[in-house]
Amino acid sequence: LPITAITGKSEFMKAFDDLWVSSTNNSEALSLAGTIAVINEMKEKNTIKSCWNQGTKLFEKWNQVVTSYNINAKLVGYPIRMKMECLDTNGNESIILKSLILQEMVKKGIFMSQGVSFLSYSHSSEDIEFTLNALDETCKTISSIENESEYKNFLEGEIPKTVWSMKIPPTKKN
């Protein structure tokens, strides 16, 4: 079961002294025990620092590789939550370049999201090196294409399209 905690500064938490907080699973101890075990594991193995270190290595070296091939496909965001931003020569987003990179990376055993990618404690230094080697091979393939207008000819499927988007109507001001 999920676990929730209501926390905060003591000055704000005092408000709960006069409140009755009810929860469906108040006496359910298994999730609490599991949470404690996970927190202890995270502390013992310093997983947060490890994720930031591995993510920083991937983030920085990825950007060095694509820059060395003059391919505008940089990782942006944070080393633990990054997104590949692909731009054409005019500085516009290039879904074709992103699709081509993702296609070639999958062929080399690396699956990446079109959106954000998260780094986890299970990603080893070997995984990072494997990813960077796959990227280097992918960049060699892409840099051999003479003109970016030809990228779509190398895609082995349709150009991805948005399948769902949420349109929020403007709110009226009173």
Regions found by a protein language model. Name each.
Residues 1-174:
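Conserved N-terminal phosphate-binding loop of PLP-dependent enzymes in the Aspartate aminotransferase
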